[in-house]
A protein has these predicted regions:
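Cytosolic juxtamembrane helix and N-cap/initiation of the first transmembrane helix
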Residues: 2-34
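Interfacial loop at the N-terminal end of multi-pass membrane proteins
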Residues: 7-17, 44-62
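Juxtamembrane helix-break-helix junctions at the cytosolic face
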Residues: 13, 76-91
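Transmembrane alpha-helix/helix-exit interface in multi-pass inner-membrane proteins
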Residues: 28-47
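Core segments of alpha-helical transmembrane spans in multipass integral membrane proteins
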Residues: 32-34, 59-81, 95-98
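Hydrophobic alpha-helical membrane segments
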Residues: 90-106, 126-131
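Membrane-helix boundary connector in multi-pass membrane proteins
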Residues: 102-120
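Membrane-water interface at the C-terminal end of transmembrane alpha helices
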Residues: 126-146
Length: 146
């Protein structure tokens, strides 16, 4: 009976680790996708995301969006290549989402600078929060990172 319980526990641990690894990859892909979009098509991002009265569509605004996107690509690359522990998931989930929720609320709903397209950013931030919490729960008690 104990060997069956041990096998079941080992299977549960392996499944949790696979899920955590998949979540880490999804987190990285969100950063890489949205960041890459800013790098490769800053004019499109500016046109879709900013209300007309705030659009500049200048080389400077394109450069700023590309810098923003490059930082997201860097974070996505690091997330993809790094090994996450439970604490990494938790800290990443909180730091990669909570400050940006404040940003989204302020600039989408309070100052109304952004269009509804900016809800893609909000969805990305929500995914970071959920992935961080779920990854943390899956990896609690694990000593080997994924």
């Amino acid at each position: 009976m104990t060997s069956q319980v041990s096998l079941r526990e080992a299977d549960d641990i392996a499944r949790a680790r696979r899920t955590a690894r998949t979540l880490k990859t999804v987190l990285a892909l969100v950063f890489l996708g949205l960041g890459g979009w800013c790098v490769l098509a800053p004019g499109m991002v500016e046109t879709l995301a900013l209300r007309e009265e705030y659009r500049h569509l200048s080389p400077t605004s394109a450069l700023l969006l590309q810098c923003f996107g490059a930082q997201a690509v860097l974070v996505g690359s690091l997330a993809l290549l790094s090994r996450f522990t439970a604490i990494t998931f938790l800290v990443f989930g909180l730091l990669a989402s909570v400050p940006f929720f404040v940003f989204n609320v302020w600039f989408v709903w309070v100052s109304e600078m952004f269009t509804a397209w900016m809800l893609l950013d909000f969805a990305g931030n929500a995914s970071f929060f959920l992935i961080g919490i779920i990854g943390w729960r899956l990896m609690r008690g694990e000593t080997e990172p994924v």
